[in-house]
Amino acid sequence: MPVVMARDLEETASSSEDEDLANQEDHPCIMWTGGCRRIPVLVFHAEAILTKDNNIRVIGERYHLSYKIVRTDSRLVRSILTAHGFHEVHPSSTDYNLMWTGSHLKPFLLRTLSEAQKVNHFPRSYELTRKDRLYKNIIRMQHTHGFKAFHILPQTFLLPAEYAEFCNSYSKDRGPWIVKPVASSRGRGVYLINNPNQISLEENILVSRYINNPLLIDDFKFDVRLYVLVTSYDPLVIYLYEEGLARFATVRYDQGSKNIRNQFMHLTNYSVNKKSGDYVSCDDPEVEDYGNKWSMSAMLRYLKQEGKDTTALMAHVEDLIIKTIISAELAIATACKTFVPHRSSCFELYGFDVLIDNTLKPWLLEVNLSPSLACDAPLDLKIKASMISDMFTVVGFVCQDPAQRTSNRSIYPSFESSRRNPFQKPQRTRPLSASDAEMKNLVASAREKVPGKLGGSVLGLSMEEIKVLRRVKEENDRRGGFIRIFPTSETWEIYGSYLEHKTSMNYMLATRLFQDRGNPRRSLLTGRARVSTEGAPELKVESMNSKAKLHAALYERKLLSLEVRKRRRRSGRLRAMRPKYPVIAQPAEMNIKTETESEEEEEVGLDNDDEEQEASQEESAGSLGENQAKYTPSLTVIVENSPRDNAMKVAEWTNKGEPCCKIEAQEPESKFNLMQILQDNGNLSKVQARLAFSAYLQHVQIRLTKDSGGQTLSPSWAAKEDEQMELVVRFLKRASSNLQHSLRMVLPSRRLALLERRRILAHQLGDFIGVYNKETEQMAEKKSKKKLEEEEEDGVNAESFQEFIRQASEAELEEVLTFYTQKNKSASVFLGTHSKSSKNSSSYSDSGAKGDHPETIQEVKIKQPKQQQATEIHADKLSRFTTSSGKEAKLVYTNCSSFCSPAAVLLQRLPSSHLSSVITTSALSAGPGHHASLSQIPPAVPSLPHQPALLLSPVPDNAPPSIHSGTQNVSPAGLPRCRSGSYTIGPFSSFQSAAHIYSQKLSRPSSAKAAGSCHPHKHHSGIAKTQKEGEDVSLNRRYNQSLVTAELQRLAEKQAARQYSPASHISLLTQQVTNLNLASSVINRSSASTPPTLRPVISPSGPTWSIQPDLHASETHSSPPGSRSLQTGGFAWEGEVENNAYSKTTGVVPQHKYHPTAGSYQLHFALQQLEQQKLQSRQLLDQSRARHQAIFGSQTLPNSSLWTMNNGPGCRISSATTGGQKPNTLPQKVVAPPNSSTLVSKPASNHKQVLRKPASQRASKGSSAEGQLNGLQSSLNPAAFMPITNSTGSLEAPQVIFARSKPLPTQSGALATVIGQRKSKSVKSGTI
């Protein structure tokens, strides 16, 4: 904010300023520091380079923070600074907060720095980064403290000065040597020799003994790039970043001298190996152990799995780093004291290259002044962006406008200067200076606290020492992914004596931070320091302290990607969980506990949120997100539970800055290590395995969602994404067929844009997960009801498992699921087998046994045979019913056991005026393993657009039931086989139930466990029984579950006791339906009686289609006389009824294979025309009818269509087609529900004769079928059953039977009652 505004607001102490400060205190990019917590320091977030969040930029823009980059080009640094509101200034400008340079700094430039300005190099840092100076410093330390204490470099000689010594050493050991220029990088000028004559002495070079026993991974040599941050040389403060890079050679290692010139084998520099044709790059940031560049944590995890002691290895690495920096500490600290006006002005990031031999001893290769920050792979970006962001946070950029330079004034300003600093918190009454206030606070708190605590003895410290002590502690609070390796209580005892820069700051820092260590530990550390001074002993695991083990666990954990943190920030969970870097609320509270105890609590805690990689679409954290609310478990618990991979997550901070004594009193909380439990003969229950699989699928859905935008659409990326989406599509196709519940698959077409396909696929995967979770819950409820105690014993602790699922990453879940699958030798528990397989305990009965609501209409997928896939027709709208590959068709059914009478209860609740016509086509299968399909229907007609709303939404109380007809398929035997796909869910009997009642002697159902079958054994007879039960319920207007169950069981036992003949219940039915001439009748009657909003269209998909017309349109539409007459009575064709009943009874099988004729195609084309002309006048429809009658006049159609229509609101239309031959005799009867119409063929001109004919035929009908019905017919009053045959038993002209919905007292009087009712109402049949 402007300076004037800051002054005015401070003087007036306005409420707006207080609100602004309150907002800043809560800002995720602000941490308040200083004695009174009035100095804002910027906190960096690596994910900001992806989110472009204005909330992150606003702080930098408000304070006009700026930077300049000199003699280098780092896109990563520029991107991170720009994302946080920094703006770049000219390299010659002096108004900047950060100067990032790629070269050493001149002394005059350092002298001009203000305390708020920072540069990324120390003066004389070449003492470390030049190979000759590093060698000289190490040699000096070896001479001073012993060769073994600083034996961190291979044997080295500086040529040409030490050429004679080199030749002398070579004569003793003629192994290979490596030559390096003293001031080069990236492997330039490096080569191997095996003879001194091969060396050129024209320039200064370094010759080192080649380490010919390197540690190999898969026979490849590698080294490790470590990132070391030094924030001060006086006192010396060293941080090591928890993540690094393992760089591999591209040629397998061979010690033979013939390969000595092969740089791709012996050099591991990325700049060298990237030129190799064998270089492999990994494009997935989540995969860290693939290709020629691994993460250091992945390398450590691999070594740990191989049985290597990674704790000792990393302890050796820390030892090497500390000794290396100490060797140059004197020269650099002296230069800083001479040239740098402020202790906090400089910082430096070093790149340590370390080679590990096969004894796990690390060797220092070189130290890089400006380690490469190029991001050539996603893994580079993840590691380096996190590291740079954490480094900037540790360094601490004060939010101060660089134009308001205070020169050499203290950052803790006087009263006058504070009025000009906008970042300073206002205070109404202030002492002489902020520093004095800090001192008084410290002294006052020291007097109040118990002696022996840290804050109790600040007396005697100078102002400068107090500020240094506070700054070091605040840096440690902001360290993020950096680990302070010096000073710590252990490293100070070991390496303190090596420091050569004898100032009071190092000693003060150590004594104030670690003064109250316990006597036993102090004696142990003193002994270690003494032995180390005498001979630099080998570091062993037995002597490792707790902090070393914790550090090893930190190095092994996996760093979270930027995308993960981006999703968390987007969901707002980062601020909701905790402030990023909690600060002690009052300065006095830092006196409660010693720095040593505080550090232990901060570093020992477990970071639970590090493992939250995508438990839902937003559940992941970034590397900065590692610093969540902390816990303080004991060391033994942490070490015992540290996983092989990266489950160990260590916290960095105390919880919300609360006093450490409160945290100390908390109970230790151990980390739940699921993989360890599984490896120790533990196991998951089936429900737990499904929960883990569901969480894994949610991670996959997150990846699909997050990548749907913001990507560079390169061909390689598009090909990769297409391949991954294809895997998900194949999974959904296979897995959805195993679901017991319905699932509508709308898989995206490959013609769509890539990002649109990802969006649709992510949505479909989400739907699948929802249904999958429902089934898992039902499984859990079912097991809990049955009290399966063995399942509980097999599973792990439920609460711990839920916590693991919530926090686990995708990689961890994948590892657990893979191990579980291998252990149980099956993955069927995740998806099960075919839930609708042909078993008696199929999902038809299972789904209804769960107590689901009977009003829920669901969708079932039927897997089609492979021979039919080629002919399956796929339109865009057709995908609502079938998957994009055509392997699955769908069928709507009520969610009850075996389609039983709960559906009738639904219809009882519906008003009679809203009941749609209910009629179904019998399509029972005549052979095992054959499914319904209408794939032979031509693809000319589009499917109806209103389908999804019907299929997905539950049926309301005032909505009529849907009739869903099945499909047919040609069997290998050449017979038209049909599976029942049409079920009447109403209280009135349907065509199928009537056929069953009048035949009674049906053939054995033939769906016996055929490959790909999705129907139970007793599916067909069970359907008829269900219809029967439904009628009973409708008659009594009540639903009795026990009565229905008993009746179903009784009928099933009677049916099973009969002798069945194979394939006799379908043959003549299919023959008769195919011989009906529907060309004129369907067109005529649909045009005459059907309102435009209800006229049907045949879908090329062939399963079932239903539409829900506009209620207003259907209610207000004026119906023609024929339509009104249809509302008063039901129609059915006599000949078809007789044919179908006879075919069920006799079981005559047709002898020729069904082949659709041209007439059937023309019929469907006519129906398509009707759909397209539904809003036109009746005159146009009559013309269309006449045209098609002329076409089909001389042809016999092999298909017939049964149309169910109703003019009432909310009615639904269903259709089915079947094919077959014309039978000889046609004993059959049908009953149509009220307010329904069956339009099959053109009726005869004399309707009264049609009505009288069934009465005379009834006497000649065989009594065997009726005798079996006498016990049940009395309960079926709502419908009239009228068998119709002619004298010859063959089909004559199509006839119509009218069945009333009013209950009839007896079956014998049904016909007379119907005729009497129609006469009394004077209903004219007319042309329909």
Curated annotation (Swiss-Prot):
Tissue-wise expression: Highly expressed in brain, kidney, liver, spleen and testis. Expressed in heart, lung, muscle and trachea.
Any matching Pfam family: TTL
Low complexity bias: start-end ranges: 838-847
Cofactor(s) demanded: Mg(2+)
Region (Disordered): 1-22, 411-436, 585-631, 834-853, 948-975, 1006-1032, 1085-1129, 1212-1271
GO biological-process terms attached to the record: fertilization; flagellated sperm motility; protein modification process; retina development in camera-type eye; sperm axoneme assembly; spermatogenesis
Polar residues composition-biased segments: 420-432, 1116-1128, 1214-1227, 1234-1248, 1257-1271
Key words, A-Z: ATP-binding, Cell projection, Cilium, Cytoplasm, Cytoskeleton, Ligase, Magnesium, Metal-binding, Microtubule, Nucleotide-binding, Nucleus, Transcription
Catalytic function, reaction form: L-glutamyl-[protein] + L-glutamate + ATP = gamma-L-glutamyl-L-glutamyl-[protein] + ADP + phosphate + H(+); (L-glutamyl)(n)-gamma-L-glutamyl-L-glutamyl-[protein] + L-glutamate + ATP = (L-glutamyl)(n+1)-gamma-L-glutamyl-L-glutamyl-[protein] + ADP + phosphate + H(+)
Record-listed a protein binding positions: 186
Region feature (c-MTBD region): 378-488
Residues the record lists as binding Mg(2+) 1: 353, 366
Designated name of the protein: Tubulin polyglutamylase TTLL5
Organism: Mus musculus
